[in-house]
Design a protein with these regions (language model features):
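Mature extracytoplasmic domains of secretory-pathway proteins
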Residues: 60-72, 110-174
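Post-signal-peptide N-terminal segment of Sec-exported extracytoplasmic proteins
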Residues: 41-75
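Bacterial signal peptide processing site
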Residues: 22-24
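C-terminal motif of bacterial Sec signal peptides marking the signal peptidase cleavage site
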Residues: 17-20
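Short, low-complexity, disordered segments immediately C-terminal to signal peptides
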Residues: 26-36
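Bacterial N-terminal signal peptides that target proteins for export
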Residues: 1-7
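A short beta-strand micro-motif
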Residues: 36-49, 144-154
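C-terminal partner/receptor-binding element of secreted or periplasmic proteins
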Residues: 36-38, 78-137, 173-202
Length: 202
């Protein structure tokens, strides 16, 4: 009985690791960011997409600064702080307001490749509810070939990223999105963005 349980457990672990499950990969990425930090570059931009500042490091982590959370009548945190706490090595930076993009080493801004205005027309018939279900499944398990076009808060083009296995995830900080692009983390704060299936733009 114990042997059968052990074999089942080992097969399950092997299957999970072989499928490249995005959810599992996100969990490991989050754990690595929390305990070791990620090798990342963080850039902030003004409303016209002009670079304000840039910071890079081998041990970088971004989270919501809980000190700025508001509380309800019972004293419970609403977890609504818009202030980001950036840990860069042994230093801390607080950021709020301007657009921010943090890219893990290995990601490449492909803005010049996709800087034209997207004009998409698709005339095939489909079942929207089924498409959403399939897309949600792929987001959790395999990711999809996507292009992310990012704009500043006033709509000025800022950056573009593309990947074969892209999945979108929520962040604990308001106005912040986290993406996993081919195993690398991308954090987008206070930016407009559109995520396209890559085939639509190629």
């Amino acid at each position: 009985m114990k042997k059968r349980y052990l074999i089942t457990l080992l097969i399950s672990i092997a299957l999970l690791s072989l499928t490249g499950c995005q959810s599992v990969e996100k969990w490991f990425k989050n754990a690595k960011e929390e305990w070791l930090g990620l090798e990342m570059t963080v850039r902030t931009y003004d409303e016209n997409s002009q670079l304000i500042d840039q910071m890079s490091g081998k041990s970088l982590s971004i989270s919501r600064n809980e000190e700025f959370d508001s509380v309800d009548a019972e004293g419970n945190s609403k977890e609504d702080s818009s202030v980001l706490k950036i840990t860069l090595g042994k230093y801390e930076i607080d950021h709020v307001g301007s657009s921010l993009i943090a890219e893990e080493k290995g990601l490449k801004d492909v803005f010049s490749q996709y800087q034209k205005t997207a004009d998409v027309e698709e005339n095939s018939h489909a079942v929207p509810v089924l498409n959403r279900m399939i897309s949600a499944f792929k987001n959790e398990f395999t990711g999809k070939k996507k292009v992310i076009l990012i704009r500043s808060q006033n709509g000025t083009p800022l950056a573009a990223y593309a990947g074969d296995r892209v999945s979108l995830d929520k962040s604990d900080a308001p106005k912040t999105s986290e993406l996993l692009i081919d195993g690398k983390r991308l954090v987008i704060y206070r930016c407009d963005y559109t995520i396209y299936d890559r085939e639509l733009l190629e």
